[in-house]
From Swiss-Prot:
Keywords: Cell membrane, Membrane, Transmembrane, Transmembrane helix
Protein name, entry field: Uncharacterized protein SAUSA300_0205
Record GO cellular component, one term: plasma membrane
Lineage, uppermost ranks: Bacteria, Bacillati, Bacillota, Bacilli, Bacillales
Species assigned in the record: Staphylococcus aureus (strain USA300)
Transmembrane portions of the chain: 6-26
Recorded coiled-coil stretches: none
Cysteines paired by S-S bonds: none
Principal localisation: membrane
Length: 257
């Protein structure tokens, strides 16, 4: 009888310890996510950059090996893609190069269209652009008024979005490697998120489409300066082709020596 009692006492102790340890692990993981979200909030709060020309005066990640006469360049890229079953059907892409030395922003707007019935039948067009007084203008004449208006009114989420609102979602997972400063955020966003609303309105995406988000980049999560980052939005609707919006901001510092 005594041995039987000891057995149950030991079992109860093991269960209690397991519950306490599991609870501590859960709280530790929850606290880590809160801490990482706070760090990402510092990074994302440096946006929006409403005037792209202010990037002339903004430095990216620091590197002591570079000299003062290095060529500093920001690259801003966005793309809107319609993807069928393992194939790209349509893509519109804007790429801008912000030269901090010459104080010039140049780039191109590309369109790619693939025929769903004939994979070899694709159309690619490219339109050179530049930015003057924070407005995108063509460097060559474009006769299509609708396309011209579409490109000239183009804005990046880093200009007009509310990136910190992404962190309000309860369905997010954030990881950060302090050794490399690489971070990754992934999860789902509701239709009420202002960035989701803006993209759906801009690209005529179905209102009921579900949205997944992914954010990748390099940062110490202290928000000291703008860092390289890539942002992805995945829109899915039953029976519809998937729509992907990508946007990236990268900094390139090339030594002349």
């Amino acid at each position: 009888m005594k041995a039987h009692k000891i057995f149950w006492l030991n079992l109860a102790a093991i269960i209690i310890i397991s519950i306490v340890v599991s609870g501590d692990m859960f709280l530790a993981m929850k606290w880590e996510q809160i801490h990482l979200k706070d760090g990402l909030k510092k990074v994302l709060s440096t946006y929006p950059i409403k005037n792209l020309e202010t990037l002339y005066e903004i430095d990216g990640h620091d590197n002591p090996h570079y000299e003062n006469n290095d060529q500093d360049t920001w690259y801003i890229e966005s793309s809107y893609s319609v993807v069928g079953s393992d194939e790209l059907l349509k893509e519109d892409r804007m790429l801008l190069k912000v030269d901090k030395n010459t104080h010039k922003i140049t780039g191109e707007y590309d369109t790619t269209t693939n025929d769903k019935k004939n994979a070899t039948d694709s159309t690619y067009k490219s339109y050179p652009v530049k930015v003057v007084n924070n407005k995108i203008v063509f460097t060559k004449d474009v006769k299509d008024p609708a396309l011209k208006q579409k490109i000239e009114n183009n804005q990046f989420l880093i200009q007009s979005g509310d990136l910190t609102s992404i962190l309000n979602s309860n369905d997010l997972k954030v990881t950060h490697d302090p050794t490399t400063d690489y971070y990754n955020l992934s999860g789902k966003l509701s239709n009420d998120n202002p960035n989701v609303k803006q993209l759906k309105r801009r690209y005529n995406i179905p209102k009921n489409a579900s949205t997944k988000v992914e954010l990748k980049g390099m940062s110490d999560l202290k928000g000291n300066n703008h860092q390289d980052q890539k942002l992805y939005f995945y829109f899915s609707s039953p029976g519809k082709d998937q729509i992907i919006y990508k946007e990236s901001l990268t900094y390139n510092k090339i030594s002349e020596h």
